[in-house]
UniProtKB/Swiss-Prot annotation:
Localization in the cell: Cytoplasm; Nucleus
Entry keyword set: Chaperone, Cytoplasm, Metal-binding, Nucleus, Zinc, Zinc-finger
Family membership noted in the UniProt record: Belongs to the NPL4 family.
Gene name linked to the record: npl-4.2
GO biological process, one term: ubiquitin-dependent protein catabolic process
Function text: In association with ufd-1 and ATPase cdc-48.1 and/or cdc-48.2, involved in the cytoplasmic elimination of misfolded proteins exported from the ER. This pathway, known as ERAD, prevents the activation of the unfolded protein response (UPR) caused by the accumulation of misfolded proteins in the ER.
Main subcellular localisation: cytoplasm
Protein name: Nuclear protein localization protein 4 homolog 2
GO CC, one annotated term: nucleus
Pfam family, one: zf-NPL4
Length: 529
């Protein structure tokens, strides 16, 4: 019996690949070279991926994680057997010390954490955030556009090699999952997500994972011109202390699995993206991570935000319990005379905790979901999850309207929609088995039209879900609950009066279909002449 290790406990494929690369940066023969083509000199010898002059020349602020590892391994010398140079930062007491009674009755230098001296992190776990296409983020921003309330979502995608940085890694975003949340004009509150394990299981079937989170901080400047205020800049703040603490909590929940640490984890690849106004007063996207030091302080629960100054954090003065230990935190800064002085971390600027990660979109958009251009002519869209507050409901009328846009041989296009797949596994009407969902996800990943058509024809759970949607759609959801797509075709299902349009009965399964369909939405067979 083969037991598969969960995705969250495996070394990521991109790390496995990069660990096999030599990382050397090849340099061509230059004008200062005085030797034959096959020879090398100091001007054209390959340089290491952590070479400071090369990084400065290419304007790379932080070396990549694997370049950082190579630098540590190289500093140990060729004869050493040290292969795990990464040591996790610790701000809490080491548990189960045998030398004394548990704290506060006893403490020693072995279990006591060292004084934290904040340093700007010189490397980053992720070197770039690439959002596949503009439609993806526009759909996310629609919630703020319709309600005026801020919104948060999890970035769904995968980690891939980033060729612009030596041994670099990029987070490619293919979809955005919007968890249960309470949204306000000036803030967001996470709510309990009862479907978290189910969603993670779906992501594993799709070969994807949560690579980060995104939130809006948009304030309308001129609604007619579509401009927003420029609020986050060097004279205010980039991330508030509260946002840094939240980012650190999420990074701690998504550790970076690596064989270069004795703990088998070090830091995190989980990224943070902020959607806010830029200098041109248009919505732009800015990427960050918090440092490993920040994540360690949050894990030890010694860091908290200040009340009126978002750019400052504060190290707790009073322990939360008798067993809670607060270590000292300090940082260096220049005083009014230009001299370096040490300051206590009460308060401390969050700029010491941040690592910039460039975020953007490729020149040529890519579509992991809704592949191809055939869907652009469709008038219906499948609603995003957890948007009941603005009247966007999944299932019922929305499912009927969305499904009616596709014939059976177009079921692959219908299923190549992250929010549709998410609804199949999280709806509270019909539970589709993991075996059937795995089969559909494999078809979506491979873009296998034949398998997708077979799934639509053979999956009884899908047939039952559609039957319930037709039953509920005819007498339940009102069309006003479903947002109207501009220039789209009107919904031809149930009307607000509850009357039904023309229907025809399938000669094979007797299902009542809407007029205009050429095949049965239940069994997929063509209409009889």
């Amino acid at each position: 019996m083969v037991i598969e290790v969960p995705q969250t406990e495996r070394v990521n494929d991109v790390d496995v690949f990069l660990s096999t690369q030599d990382g050397q940066i090849q340099r061509p023969k230059g004008p200062n070279c005085r030797h034959p083509v096959r020879q090398k000199c100091t001007n054209c010898l390959p340089v290491d991926p952590f070479d400071e002059e090369y990084l400065k020349e290419k304007d790379i602020k932080h070396m990549s994680f694997h370049a950082h590892v190579r630098k540590l391994l190289g500093s140990q010398g060729k004869g050493t057997t040290l292969k795990k140079p990464l040591e996790n930062f610790r701000c809490s007491l080491k548990p189960n010390c045998d030398a004394h009674k548990p704290f506060p009755k006893g403490i020693c230098t072995k279990c006591k954490p060292q004084v934290v001296t904040l340093n700007r992190q010189k490397f980053r776990h992720v070197d770039n955030i690439q959002i596949e296409n503009q439609e993806l983020v526009n759909q996310f921003l629609d919630y703020w556009r319709l309600s005026g309330h801020q919104r948060v979502g999890f970035l769904i995608g995968q980690y891939q090699p980033h060729l612009e940085v030596p041994l670099g890694i990029k987070a490619t975003v293919a979809a955005i999952y919007e968890p249960p949340q309470h949204c306000r004009e000036d803030g967001i509150e996470f709510l309990e997500d009862k479907n978290q394990k189910t969603i993670d299981n779906l992501l594993e079937m799709l070969g994807l994972q949560r690579v980060g989170w995104i939130f809006t901080d948009c304030w309308t400047a001129n609604s007619a011109e579509g401009t927003v205020h420029y609020t986050r800049h060097k004279d205010s703040f980039f991330l508030s202390a509260e946002e840094c603490i939240t980012a650190a909590m999420l990074q701690n929940q998504h550790p970076n699995i690596t064989e270069y640490s004795m703990d088998r984890h070090y830091g995190s690849k989980f990224v943070t993206v902020v959607a806010s106004g830029d200098e041109s007063m248009h919505v732009n996207f800015h990427g960050y991570q918090v440092s490993n030091q920040c994540a360690a302080m949050v894990e030890a629960d010694i860091l908290c935000p200040t009340l009126y100054t978002p750019e400052l954090a504060y190290v707790r003065e009073t322990p939360l319990s008798e067993e809670h230990y607060i270590t000292d935190v300090q940082f260096s800064m220049k005083n009014e005379y230009g001299a370096e002085v040490m300051k206590n971390g009460r308060p401390l600027p969050v700029e010491y905790l941040l690592v910039d990660v460039p975020a953007g979109m490729p020149k040529e958009p890519h579509y992991t979901f809704h592949v191809g251009t055939s869907n652009k002519s469709k008038s219906a869209k499948f609603n995003v999850e957890n948007r009941q507050a603005i009247g966007q409901l999944q299932g019922g009328a929305n499912l009927i309207q969305y499904s009616s846009e596709f014939s059976t041989n177009q079921f692959l296009e219908q299923a190549t929609n992250f929010h549709f797949l998410l609804y199949l596994v999280t709806n509270d009407q019909v539970q589709i088995s993991d075996e059937w969902m795995k089969r559909l996800c494999d078809a979506v990943k491979a873009q296998d039209r034949g398998t997708a058509m077979e799934w639509a024809q053979e999956c009884e759970d899908w047939h039952q879900l559609m039957a319930l949607a037709h039953a509920n759609g005819g007498s339940g959801n009102d069309v006003s609950d479903i947002p109207v797509i501009p220039n789209g075709d009107p919904f031809s299902g149930s009307s607000s009066g509850g009357s039904r349009g023309a229907v025809w009965s399938c000669g094979h399964c007797t299902f009542q279909n809407e007029a205009g369909r050429q095949d049965c939405s239940m069994c997929g067979l063509p209409a009889a002449d």
